[in-house]
Structures are given as C-alpha cells and as structure tokens.
Amino acid sequence: MMWRWSFLLLLLLLRHWALGKPSPDAGPHGQDRVHHGTPLSEAPHDDAHGNFQYDHEAFLGRDVAKEFDKLSPEESQARLGRIVDRMDLAGDSDGWVSLAELRAWIAHTQQRHIRDSVSAAWHTYDTDRDGRVGWEELRNATYGHYEPGEEFHDVEDAETYKKMLARDERRFRVADQDGDSMATREELTAFLHPEEFPHMRDIVVAETLEDLDKNKDGYVQVEEYIADLYSEEPGEEEPAWVQTERQQFREFRDLNKDGRLDGSEVGYWVLPPSQDQPLVEANHLLHESDTDKDGRLSKAEILSNWNMFVGSQATNYGEDLTRHHDEL
C-alpha cells in the first residue's frame, strides 16, 4: 500500500491548498486506511506466459520500468548494461554480478519510492528549514493553524477531523523515538511508512482495527472485513471475487477459526512474517539467467536475457520520455 504514497502525497497537498484539510475518508496523510507491506510489484508474476512485468518493476521500480517500455530494444539494452556496471561497482567490482549484489540492487529499487516520498514531505513539513520536522509544523501544514481549543471550529464534521488529528499525533509520538517532538528524517519515514519499521507494528495493527472494527468490539468480523472491500447495492448479486474474499477470510485470515480477527490475526494479515522479497526475486533472476550455472551473472548473461530484466518498445519510444536517467 505504501507504493502509492508519492501520488497520494500530491493529492493531499493539492487538497490542502484548495480546502485546507485532508479528507476524513482517507487515512493519515491520504494513505490507504489498511496498511500492507510494500510489494516489489503489483503485477502478476507470470513468466510462464512471457509476462515479465513483475520482474521489470522489481528490478527497475515501477516508474523507471514504464520509461524502459518506451525505449527501443537497443537503447533499453544499453541502459541495462550501465545498470549492470553500477550493480557490480556497488559490490566488489570483480566483473560479475553476485546474488548479493543483485539482491542489494532490487532492495535499493524497492526503497526508492519511500525515499522520494519522504523527500517531498520533508520539504513541505520542515517549514522553518532547521533540518527537523516538529509536530507543530506537521500538524499546521496538514490541518491548518488553530489556536488551542479552537481546532476545526470552522469546518463541518469537526469531530472526525479531531479524531484524525489525534490519530496522527499518536503515530507521530511512536515514530519520535527520542521523544523530543522533533522528527529526524528517519523518524518522519517511520511516521509516513510505518509498515516498514518493526517498532511501528503495534500502531499499524491498532489503526487497521480502528478502521475496520465498526461495532467496536475489538475484533474484525467477516462482514466488517468485506465492507471495507465492497459496498453492496440493493438487489445486486454478490460478485464471485467477494465470495472468494469470504473464503480467504475463513481459511487464511481467521487463524484460530473463531469467525473473527483479533489483533494478532490482523497483524499477521497486514504485516505477515517477513519474507525477503528482494532475495526471492534475485534468486529467480539468477536461476533464469545463469546459463553456465556458476552461481553468478556475467554482463553477457544478463544482456542475453535482457527482456526479463527490462522492457522496451520499438516505436514512439523517445518522444515523451522526459525523465533524466543519470542515476542509471
């Protein structure tokens, strides 16, 4: 879910400039209300049918993968060659790309969108340019400036906004590990992307429960789970995918089979035990490209299997490519 942050940050800022307040229908700072760990790609992993989009986005990142799709095959391969050189240079510079170097590159790509979103937020929230983001700065930049006791006196549904503000402050206090009410860049990252930090796990679970537990009994019932995904229209037959979600709830979400999700089950759902996704993808790319089976990749091996690593398009590839590729 946090892969949407850069776009959502832009929406939040536009909304703030136009209306002065974030939407009460969104989570903190425009994020989706239910947190999930950051995937390498939302595309299906379907190599068997020649669909390498998942691999492209895992290796390059979604935005850069789209740019490669606009390139000629020759330019795409040339830029891939420069990436290969950079991967090896970041490692031991022995002329080969090891599994560790490939994993490190994919992990770097996975974190790029987080770094970009935090940089944008930092510029917005650090209003006094002192190199830290105070809670007051963040609050005022997000909700507007109010005198104590007058919060949201000028808006409809003031109570909803007060709850949002309290929730943001609670998350900020957890992210602010030294308790000085001033966020470092690392602490602001934890605030904006709590699913990436172990010490933020409890707040992620608490926020998810608050959003889904409509009857406030401390659990997520199956109907509450479904209601977050689907709004039934009168007389409408429930779609097959909703029925599949009900089955998913019963078989995989409700671990103790009591018909509801408690806090630990919510945590297992939204932040499951960590799998090293970059390592899994690195092993996959190595297995598919290591033709001499020596456990490492030469530049030639990567380029010979270039269409698994990056995409291309033979026509109209240069006209709307505006981003500079210095980092590649």
UniProtKB/Swiss-Prot annotation:
Cysteines paired by S-S bonds: none
Tissue and organ expression note: Highly expressed in lung and heart. Also detected in liver, spleen, kidney, skeletal muscle, intestine, stomach, and brain.
Listed GO biological process terms: collagen biosynthetic process; ERAD pathway; lung epithelium development; phospholipid homeostasis; positive regulation of peptidase activity; protein secretion; protein transport; regulation of phosphatidylinositol 3-kinase/protein kinase B signal transduction
UniProt-annotated binding residues for Ca(2+) 1: 92, 94, 96, 101
Gene3D superfamilies the UniProt entry points to: EF-hand (1.10.238.10)
PTM text: Degraded by PCSK6 and other endoproteases including FURIN and PCSK5. N-glycosylated.
Keyword Glycoprotein listed: yes
Signal peptide: 1-20
Entry GO CC: endoplasmic reticulum; endoplasmic reticulum lumen
Record: residues binding Ca(2+) 5: 254, 256, 258, 260, 265
Chain positions recorded as Ca(2+) 4 binding sites: 213, 215, 217, 219, 224
Record flagged with keyword Repeat: yes
Disruption phenotype: Homozygous knockout mice show neonatal lethality. Normally delivered newborn mice exhibit normal gross morphology, early motor activity, and response to painful stimuli. They quickly develop severe respiratory distress with gasping and cyanosis, and die within 20 to 60 minutes after birth. Normally developed trachea and diaphragm structure as well as no obvious gross morphological or histological abnormalities in the heart, brain, or liver suggest that abnormal lung development is the primary cause for the neonatal lethality.
Residues involved in Ca(2+) 2 binding: 126, 128, 130, 132, 137
PANTHER family per record: RETICULOCALBIN, RETICULOCALBIN-3
Homology family: Belongs to the CREC family.
Protein name: Reticulocalbin-3
Gene: Rcn3
